[in-house]
Amino acid sequence: MAVDMFIKVGTIEGESVDKTHAGKIDVLAWSWGMSQSGTTHQGGGGGAGKVNVQDISFTKYVDKSTTNLMSACCKGTHFDDAVLIVRKAGDKPLEYIKITMKEVIVTSLSTGGSGGEDRLTENVTLNFAEFKVEYQEQNPKGGSKG
């Protein structure tokens, strides 16, 4: 399934020309996770530890958001929120994943390239105080289920 992905980080503008997400940052790839330090392998009682929520990382083209993201990383700028949208592409696009982050800072930005690339890319990492994940189930035809 082909997808379109976009992120909005505070007031920073990207170069998306999508009619629904114009001005957001086009996302090429993203990664995020969390881990739990359970103790079930240490005998009876199997307690759960404290969750470790990782920073979210995304890959994007170098664009007009680049220098603003760099500046935000250098200054430790705090943004009220950031929102990542993943949408099924096609005639009837369906936004099926939405991750909203609150109290966001840019924790890293790395860029580079080689002569063989069409466009330069960069990786950006965000840290946040809280998050909300929303998921929209799809029906067999690719539309919204419920």
Language model segments and positions:
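Glycine-rich, low-complexity intrinsically disordered segments
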Residues: M1-G146
